[in-house]
C-alpha cells in the first residue's frame, strides 16, 4: 500500500516543484524546520537528488531525502546510487553534499572518493580545487614524502593531503589526476 502525501499552502493549493534533476535550492520547502523537495505533482521526492545551487547548470551538488520521512538528511551514511552501487556519502548540516576533506577522507558532492581497486593510491582532482592522493579506502595521504601506487609512481603530499610531487618532481597547479566521481544520478 503505497501512500503519497501532499503539502497544501494557506491558499489550499498543493506545493509543487520542478522535474527531478532540475531543482534548485530555492525550490526547497521548509516545514517545521525540515527541508522537503516536491515534484510537479506535489509529491515529496526521496533518494539521491541533483540540486542546482545557482542558476548556472554547472553549479550543482547532491542532497539526499529519506524514503520514509522525505526530509533532507545530514551526516555520514551509505546510499545506494542509481546503478545499484552502495557508496559512502557525507552531507553538511544544510543537507548539501560535502566537497573537500572530512575526517581524513576526500568527498566530492557528498560522495567518498576512493582510488580504483588494484591501484593502492591514486591522484584525484576536485574540479575547481586541488589534487589529492587517496587510497582505496578513500583516506588521503598527508605529509607524505612518497607513497607509491601499484605501478611504482611515487607521490608526495603536504599537511592537507594536496599533491606536491610526482616521482620527486614538484608539481604546480592543481589539474593532476583523474577528476573526482560524481554521484550516479537518477536523471
List the model feature ranges, each with a label.
Residues 1-187:
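Extracellular adhesion/carbohydrate-binding repeat motifs centered on closely spaced tryptophans
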Amino acid at each position: 500500500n503505497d501512500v503519497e502525501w501532499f503539502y497544501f499552502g494557506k491558499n489550499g493549493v498543493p506545493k509543487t516543484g520542478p522535474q527531478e534533476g532540475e531543482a534548485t535550492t530555492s525550490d526547497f520547502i521548509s516545514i517545521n524546520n525540515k527541508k522537503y523537495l516536491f515534484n510537479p505533482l506535489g509529491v515529496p521526492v526521496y533518494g539521491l537528488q541533483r540540486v542546482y545551487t545557482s542558476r548556472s547548470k554547472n553549479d550543482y551538488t547532491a542532497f539526499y531525502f529519506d524514503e520514509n520521512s522525505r526530509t533532507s538528511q545530514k551526516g555520514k551514511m551509505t546510499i545506494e546510487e542509481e546503478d545499484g552501487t552502495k557508496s559512502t556519502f557525507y552531507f553538511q548540516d544544510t543537507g548539501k553534499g560535502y566537497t573537500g576533506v572530512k575526517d581524513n577522507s576526500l568527498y566530492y558532492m557528498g560522495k567518498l572518493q576512493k582510488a580504483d581497486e588494484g591501484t593502492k593510491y591514486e591522484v584525484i582532482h576536485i574540479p575547481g580545487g586541488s589534487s589529492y592522493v587517496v587510497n582505496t579506502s578513500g583516506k588521503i595521504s598527508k605529509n607524505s614524502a612518497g607513497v607509491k601506487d601499484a605501478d611504482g609512481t611515487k607521490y608526495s603530499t603536504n599537511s592537507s593531503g594536496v599533491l606536491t610531487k610526482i616521482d620527486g618532481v614538484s608539481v604546480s597547479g592543481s589539474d593532476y589526476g583523474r577528476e573526482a566521481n560524481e554521484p550516479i544520478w537518477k536523471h
